[in-house]
Amino acid sequence: MAACNSNYTPKPKGYFQLQFPKKQYQTFNLAGYPYSFEYPKYASVEKDSLFFGEKAENDWWINIVFPSFSGRLHISYKQIGPQNQFDSLLRDSYELTQKHTQKAYAIEDSIITTANGIEGMFFKVQGDVATETQFFLTDSTRHFLRGALYFEATPNQDSLQPVQQFIVQDIKHLIQTFRWKN
C-alpha cells in the first residue's frame, strides 16, 4: 500500500471564496421617518417591529438585511427628550459596546463628523464577538440613532472578516450620506 509509506501533511483550514457584488446604492427616504441615507442595492430594509420579543419602542427601528451574507444591520432610533435624555442614550451606547469585552481583545473607536453635519462614534470590536461593527449618530438635541451589524453565524473573526470588511464599506457610505429630515 502506497498510502502507508507516505508522509502525513496536515491541511490548513479553508474558507469559501466569496464573490462580492458590485457596489451600487439606493436611497432610503420613506415618509414619516426622521432620517434618510443610501444603502446597497443587494440589501433590503425591513421595519423592525420586535426587539427581543417585545414591541419596538417606536416605528423608526429598521434592519438593513444582507441576505447573501446572512447579516443584518440593526438600526434603532430614539428622539431625544425628557424620557430619552442625551447623556443616558450616549451612556447606553457605550455600555452596549463594552458588553463585548469578555470576548474582545480590543475596541477601537473613532469620531464621526460628516460633510452633512452628522456627528457620532464608530466602534470596531475585535475578537470573536456577536457584533464587531457598531456606531451611533446624533445631533445631540433631537435625534439619536444607533447601528450594530450582526451575522447569523457563530462568531469567528477569521471566517467573517472578508464579509465584515465588505459590509463596513457600505456602513461607512450610509454614514456619509446620512441626513436628519427635521
Predicted feature descriptions by range:
Residues 41-53, 98-112:
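Short secondary-structure junctions
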Residues 33-91:
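Secretory pathway targeting signatures of secreted, lumenal, and periplasmic proteins
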